[in-house]
């Protein structure tokens, strides 16, 4: 089981920031990534629908034989983390999410105790970050939904006048509130870090959950004795196998590949079309087990 891939799921391309951190910190592990690009963004959708879509993808990943799940989507984590853990961990598949790792880093980074959190409407309305920060009541939390950010990233627009205008509209109130640490509460948002940092100013620390989440993945694999050995498994011919990565999109694979190559590099040689889209509900048609 330790040679099985780590399953990583996001509503689109944003979770690739987490996948990149996992590849960097766990270079001997295999990754199987699914981006639900056919139904992105999740943020404006009802929580029940986000839960339904998320569990559908996670069920497919578990059926494909992944050894652990990473919910690399704040909206999904906020909507169904407890459901996912109840559904899969009893069968030996641990679940890692992205909210508490970001909270941990932000609490350590702040100097004045004023922390901003930006995310999708679904994430912000869920109050998941308020709940996660409840253990540190001395911190002052300022949250703000930034619904246009995900669509900008999914459209490949990560700089330029439209991005800067949206950043000012969403972030000026947080800057004026004096936050010194800003949690990027959506895994798409690091792709807009240039504009976000420009608007917030040099004195504000931007916190992405990617690196902390990758550390949690490592800790989880160690705790469950699932860490892949550095020299890999032996095949029938006695040779050691290298890690194998596969990235799937439920929408247009070509568009996904273009965006993915911007920050994953050579790991994305191909993106397979994971599903046949029929209206709003895709049906998995390609086996998720495989190589890149």
UniProtKB/Swiss-Prot annotation:
Residues reported in the UniProt entry to bind substrate: 10-11, 42-43, 74-75, 187-188
Enzyme nomenclature, EC number: 5.1.1.3
Pathway it works in: Cell wall biogenesis; peptidoglycan biosynthesis
UniProt record similarity statement: Belongs to the aspartate/glutamate racemases family.
Catalytic residues (UniProt): 73, 186
Protein's job: Provides the (R)-glutamate required for cell wall biosynthesis.
Protein name: Glutamate racemase
GO biological process, alphabetically ordered: cell wall organization; peptidoglycan biosynthetic process; regulation of cell shape
The keyword Nucleus is annotated on this UniProt entry: no
Class of this enzyme: isomerase
The UniProt record lists the keyword Isomerase: yes
The organism of origin for this protein: Beutenbergia cavernae (strain ATCC BAA-8 / DSM 12333 / CCUG 43141 / JCM 11478 / NBRC 16432 / NCIMB 13614 / HKI 0122)
Pfam families linked to this entry: Asp_Glu_race (PF01177)
Gene3D superfamilies assigned to the protein according to its UniProt record, in alphabetical order: 3.40.50.1860
Single GO MF descriptor: glutamate racemase activity
Tree of life domain: Bacteria
Catalytic activity line of the entry: L-glutamate = D-glutamate
């Amino acid at each position: 089981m330790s040679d099985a891939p780590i399953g990583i799921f996001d509503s689109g391309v944003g979770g690739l920031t987490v996948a990149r951190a996992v590849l960097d910190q766990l270079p001997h592990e295999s990754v199987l990534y699914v981006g639900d690009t056919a139904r992105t963004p999740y943020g404006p959708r009802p929580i029940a629908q986000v839960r339904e879509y998320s569990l559908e993808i996670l069920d497919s990943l578990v059926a494909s034989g992944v050894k652990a799940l990473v919910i690399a989507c704040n909206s999904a984590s906020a909507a169904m983390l407890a459901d996912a853990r109840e559904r899969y961990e009893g069968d030996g598949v641990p679940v890692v999410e992205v909210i508490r790792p970001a909270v941990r880093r932000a609490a350590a980074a702040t100097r004045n105790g004023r922390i901003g959190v930006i995310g999708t409407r679904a994430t912000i309305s869920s109050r998941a970050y308020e709940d996660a920060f409840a253990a540190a009541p001395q911190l002052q939390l300022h949250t703000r939904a930034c619904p246009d950010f995900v669509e900008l990233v999914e459209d490949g627009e990560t700089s330029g006048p439209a991005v800067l205008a949206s950043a000012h509209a969403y972030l000026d109130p947080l800057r004026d509130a004096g936050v010194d640490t800003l949690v990027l509460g959506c895994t798409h948002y690091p792709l807009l870090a240039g504009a976000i940092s420009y608007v917030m100013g040099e004195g504000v620390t931007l916190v992405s959950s990617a690196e902390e989440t990758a550390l949690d993945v490592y800790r989880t694999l160690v705790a469950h004795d699932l860490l892949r050995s550095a020299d890999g498994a032996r095949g029938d011919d006695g040779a050691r196998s290298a890690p194998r990565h596969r990235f799937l999109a439920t929408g247009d694979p070509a568009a996904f590949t273009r965006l993915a190559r911007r920050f994953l590099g050579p790991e994305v040689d191909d993106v397979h079309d994971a599903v046949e889209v029929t209206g709003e509900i895709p049906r998995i048609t390609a086996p998720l087990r495989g190589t890149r």
